[in-house]
Regions:
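Polar-ligand-bearing catalytic/cofactor-coordination segments
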Residues: 2-6, 27-129, 162-216, 223-229
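Hydrophobic alpha-helical transmembrane segments of small proteolipidic membrane proteins, enriched
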Residues: 2-32, 142, 152-154, 162-165
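Hydrophobic alpha-helical transmembrane segments of integral membrane proteins
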Residues: 11, 15, 19, 128, ...
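Membrane-helix exit/interface motif
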Residues: 110-116, 138-148
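Core segments of transmembrane alpha-helices
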Residues: 130-139, 213
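Membrane-interfacial helix-loop-helix connectors in multipass membrane proteins
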Residues: 141-155, 224-229
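Short His/Asp/Glu-rich catalytic/ion-coordination signatures at enzyme active sites or charged loops
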Residues: 159
Length: 229
């Protein structure tokens, strides 16, 4: 049983589709967000104003919207019930700014409605955090000590895979909600709706790439473990 096999064996070929998709997704989200950061939305509303309007309309006036440093550091915190927007999104009036702001509000609406995939994902976060940090240590122990450790590491790594897969419906649903809110509240017109969809679709592709990478890595690890049995 040799640790270099984790990197140099033929099963590495399984990861090539995920690597290529990840590269494409990274390029796509970067180029698309940059492109539409330069396109001003017709209404001239900032990301903060859009978020506030969507939240208030959906009975979430108690949820604060705050600026945070960094680029595309936007997120919704279900524990703190807070929408955090990067400064470029918070103060910006671009298509990207209002689209990202609406997407994070989509998560807030999911939280209010106890959207099942989001509830499940939040529930497994502590376990996933532990598993993601411990799995590779135990997997490497499996190569040096005993294959039983390898299978234990694979079991822990599977928690990360589950998290990545469950993230997909959460993110796609949040984007769907965002587009509906932008349209129903009259924040965007028909052409802008299409542009917003491009921004959110590009962002969603990164989650697809991450999920595919995790699944293929899990399959690869299982094949390596079986070959050492």
């Amino acid at each position: 049983m040799y640790p270099y096999g984790l990197y140099m064996d033929r099963t590495f070929l399984l990861l090539i589709p995920a690597i290529l998709l990840s590269m494409y997704a990274s390029f796509k989200v970067s180029s698309t967000t940059k492109k539409y950061f330069k396109v001003r939305a017709m209404k001239g509303m900032t990301g903060q104003e859009v978020a506030r309007r969507i939240l208030d309309y959906n009975g979430l006036s108690s949820v604060p919207v705050r600026p945070v440093p960094g680029s595309l550091t936007d997120h919704y915190d279900p524990r703190g019930k807070t929408v955090s927007l990067s400064e470029e999104v918070f103060y910006g009036t671009s298509i990207t700014s209002i689209s990202v702001a609406a997407h994070e509000c989509g998560h807030a609406i999911q939280d209010k409605e106890s959207y099942a995939p989001m509830v499940f994902r939040s529930a497994i976060v502590p376990a996933v955090n532990f598993a993601s940090s411990a799995s590779w240590i135990i997997i490497m122990m499996g190569f040096f000590v005993s294959r039983q450790f390898l299978w234990l590491g694979i079991l822990l790594f599977s928690a990360t895979v589950i998290f990545q897969v469950v993230t997909l419906p959460v993110e796609f649903n949040a984007s769907s909600r965002a587009l509906k809110q932008l349209e129903s509240l009259g924040i965007v017109g028909l052409d802008e709706h299409k542009e917003s969809k491009k921004v959110l679709s590009a962002a969603a592709l990164t989650y697809v790439a991450a999920a595919l990478a995790s699944i293929l890595q899990l399959v690869r690890l299982a094949l390596l473990a079986r070959s050492d049995d």
